[in-house]
Amino acid sequence: MSISLSSLIFLPIWINMAQMQQGGSNETEQTAALKDLLSRIDLDELMKKDEPPFDFPDTLEGFEYAFNEKGQLRHIKTGEPFVFNYREDLHRWNQKRYEALGEIITRYVYELLESDCNLKKISIPVDATESEPKSFIFMSEDALTNPQKLMVLIHGSGVVRAGQWARRLIINEDLDSGTQIPFIKRAMDEGYGVIVLNPNENYIEVEKQKMHKQSSSSDGTDEPAGKRERRDKVSKETKKRRDFYEKYRNPQKEKEMMQLFIRENGSPEEHAVYVWDHFIAQAAAENVFFVAHSYGGLAFVELMIQREADVKSKVTAVALTDSVHNVWHQEAGKTIREWMRENCCNWVSSSEPLDTSVESMLPDCPRVSAGTDRHELTSWKSFPSIFKFFAEASEAKSSSQKPALTRRSHRIKHEEL
């Protein structure tokens, strides 16, 4: 007879019951009850359910997936979308598989930025030595020389990297909704230079040197040889069982890694300031525009706090998408809040139609609906409105007028009419 792994949860209860049935709780009875229960466990059956190794392909082809003509990730044989639960009851393994695919997606998007969008990969820090950790951003050929317009793209926090809005959208929906590529292509078509930030690439990881544990020496007691042998035998059996259950509980321990942070780019906020100082501030463009999603909005506000005068002199308009900034917590001053009210607009997740005014408790930029209640989709759904907003802001500046700003004001006027 064998019992399932789930039954092990009740092991302490069974032991207590065995003790009660035998009419005592001395050490001999406890040991006998435990041995009896353990002898019924089918270890071979448990081993069959062991977690497979975290050995995943490093290419889309290896995963047997590819992007079709619509930019959707599909299985090359079945045509089906990506399946997360590839193996039942192995959530951790499935998650690791998903993360491995995500790393491939990141490299794939990098390749598209260079091959499809004709962007250049620029290493930072600009004065980095050969041996120190480095990151990079992407820029169009005319990013620093375009005299008219420059668009700067900042994604949110998490696993996303340059060129992405949301990994989940890329894998489960399509490249258009999940990447910044539509923004980049339209911007270039409309005469913008483009800079794509990479605010989550803050460090590199290296494996910690394994420390060799010193073997413990004998305690040197004078106990009889027979008793010591019996104790050692019990100890070995106990260790063997403990090691087995530890292997089942955590079959593949993660490698211990240490993080080496990238100089002056150790956080999204640092990265935004660094790219401003070394690239955006040097750009020739008369009008600089930002598109910042989620935590990218917080990074922009932090940039403005640290470089207020410079930002005001160069930036014409800022489109935020479901930004998580907070002018109170970030201690943005009154002049910053006033500038944001005049030059920023935040497209937030909402079930209201696109561009409908959404009330805010914070005294900063106007908030309008992105036309979706899904956070990760706000950039893609507000895509046409953002370009219209920038065009209006640019036109207003060129005619020496304040931008009528905001889709919020347009909506209110429309409703009043």
UniProtKB/Swiss-Prot annotation:
Catalytic residue positions: S294
Keyword Hydrolase appears in the UniProt entry: no
Pfam families: Arb2
Segments carrying motif Prevents secretion from ER: 414-417
InterPro entries: AB_hydrolase_fold, Arb2, Arb2_dom
Signal sequence annotation: 1-18
Cytoplasm is among the record's keywords: yes
Glycan attachment sites: N26
Ranges of biased composition (kind: Basic and acidic residues): 224-237
Effect recorded for S294A: Loss of nucleophilicity of Ser-294
A GO CC term attached to the entry: nucleus
Full protein name: Cotranscriptional regulator ARB2A
Record organism: Mus musculus
